[in-house]
């Protein structure tokens, strides 16, 4: 089963998350099928904190991918994505 979730990147104490489509059995930061977007919780005021490709999100949900609760919450809290 394919799931859309966060994969952690960045360095220690400075997280940066990629929003990825991956197999549910893979580890959090393991191989993924496609990178759909990103989330930067420490973005400066001039930077964009989150970006997601809506067309790819629609495609993956259309073929049966589940969205993790965290990604659902991020999408609801950032409607301008």
Curated annotation (Swiss-Prot):
SUPFAM superfamilies with a match to the protein in the record: Ribosomal protein S16 (SSF54565)
Tagged with keyword Ribosomal protein: yes
Keywords: Ribonucleoprotein, Ribosomal protein
Organism taxonomic ancestry: Bacteria, Pseudomonadati, Pseudomonadota, Betaproteobacteria, Burkholderiales
Family indicated by similarity: Belongs to the bacterial ribosomal protein bS16 family.
Domain of life the protein comes from: Bacteria
Keyword NAD attached: no
Protein name per Swiss-Prot or TrEMBL: Small ribosomal subunit protein bS16
GO biological process: translation
HAMAP family: Ribosomal_bS16 (MF_00385)
GO molecular function, one term: structural constituent of ribosome
Gene Ontology CC terms, in alphabetical order: cytoplasm; small ribosomal subunit
Pfam families the UniProt entry points to: Ribosomal_S16 (PF00886)
